[in-house]
Amino acid sequence: MVAHRARRRKRASATQLYQTCKQSGTCPEDVINKIEHKTWADKILQWGSLFTFFGGLGIGTGSGTGGRTGYIPLGTRPSTVVDVTPARPPIVVESVGPTDPSIVTLVEESSVIESGASFPNFTGTAGFEVTSSSTTTPAVLDITPTSTSVHVSSTTYTNPTFVDPPVIEVPQTGEVSGNILISTPTSGVHSYEEIPMQTFAVQGTGNEPISSTPIPGLRRIAAPRLYKKAFQQVKVTDPAFLHKPETLINVDNPIFQNADTTLTFSPSGVAPDPDFLDIVALHRPAFTTRRGGVRFSRLGTKATMRTRSGKQIGARVHYYYDVSPITQTEEIEMQPLLSTDNTFDGLYDIYANIDDEAPVSSRFSIATPSRLPTNTVPLSFSGSTSNVTIPFGTSWDVPIYSGPDVVLPTGPPTWPYAPQSPFDTTHDVVIQGSTFALWPVYFLKRRRRKRIPYFLADGGVAA
């Protein structure tokens, strides 16, 4: 027979022991220190709190309030305070007419006087009348006034929603940004007409920039990348691909479509051209130059597979048609203008007279074109010999004089000192002008302690 063990009784806690043994004075020291917070840990916290302050966060106080903000339950958000903007009365904007002044004064006019609320003015009564009498006559006081007096009390309240009509206050407006809008409520009939603003007539080509700083230069448009590995390359030889590509695809219900835009088709089973089988879209065409030719290209999308969800899957095909090749520029070989068979014997002076040499003195003699003889000079070549006639009278004849070839013009001795005309143009150097202006600064210019006079002529020198 198995004996049942007695249940283990729970030991009393330190709080229960302290409540029973404190009065009798039999409590252990560790129980008293734990309950009365006199352990070493409690003493360290008490001593450290004398030098630290956490600003009312509730740390170490044991209050359990969680500081000023309190505790926030887990899984919730703190409450937010929504700022409600007070409603403001709408601002009445009055239109400005052509008769209104263009200058707006920001100082209040002195003629505008605030009169306040109107109230009636009452004049005071004559008061009481005192009747004096003799000693025998008793004093009679007339307490009834001659006219009925009325006591009127006036109280003024400020109501922001009501403005007295005789008082018009011009609002003061202060603006720093440069845009001033002054609105003043007015009453009465306006004497002007509201005319809508219109755009001024401007002249231009229509290509003017719309921004203040246009982008310099032109942006290059990216060419279509048609030769990637993701595209299947198919060459088309049928010319109908240029203007009527729909004839290469079997369409159930063909309709008119522009060939320069993207063409869409319904998938069909059989196509006239096997390269266009299962084509559902042909994108807009593009002309490119590649490998020395003009190429017409279109991108096509096929619908080879169809999933249960209705999505179509297919390859992308690049159809191209070579329109015409670009011919290379022909290189024309330059031909020599003269034959290279003839060779010269050497340097030959065509102006020399080989028949007889003239003396040196006769070369510098004065002669006219009529006096010059016309000689025939033979040219010697290895292949053949021919005579060439060269006239010697086509050049200018310049006479030669002894001394410097400078001729000064002569003029009358009286004013004005003007040179005579016509001038003698037979000389090499002719000085035009008869007056001279000498600059005083250059009379005596010091240079290396030498006095050298400089004289400049105010005239023109013509050669």
Swiss-Prot record:
InterPro entries: Late_L2. The keyword DNA-binding applies. Its main location: virion. Keywords: Capsid protein, Cytoplasmic inwards viral transport, Disulfide bond, DNA-binding, Host endosome, Host Golgi apparatus, Host nucleus, Host-virus interaction, Late protein, Microtubular inwards viral transport, Phosphoprotein, Viral penetration into host nucleus, Virion, Virus entry into host cell. It is found in: Virion; Host nucleus; Host early endosome; Host Golgi apparatus. Highly phosphorylated. Minor protein of the capsid that localizes along the inner surface of the virion, within the central cavities beneath the L1 pentamers. Plays a role in capsid stabilization through interaction with the major capsid protein L1. Once the virion enters the host cell, L2 escorts the genomic DNA into the nucleus by promoting escape from the endosomal compartments and traffic through the host Golgi network. Belongs to the papillomaviridae L2 protein family. This is Minor capsid protein L2. It comes from Human papillomavirus type 53. The lineage of its organism: Viruses, Monodnaviria, Shotokuvirae, Cossaviricota, Papovaviricetes. The gene is L2.
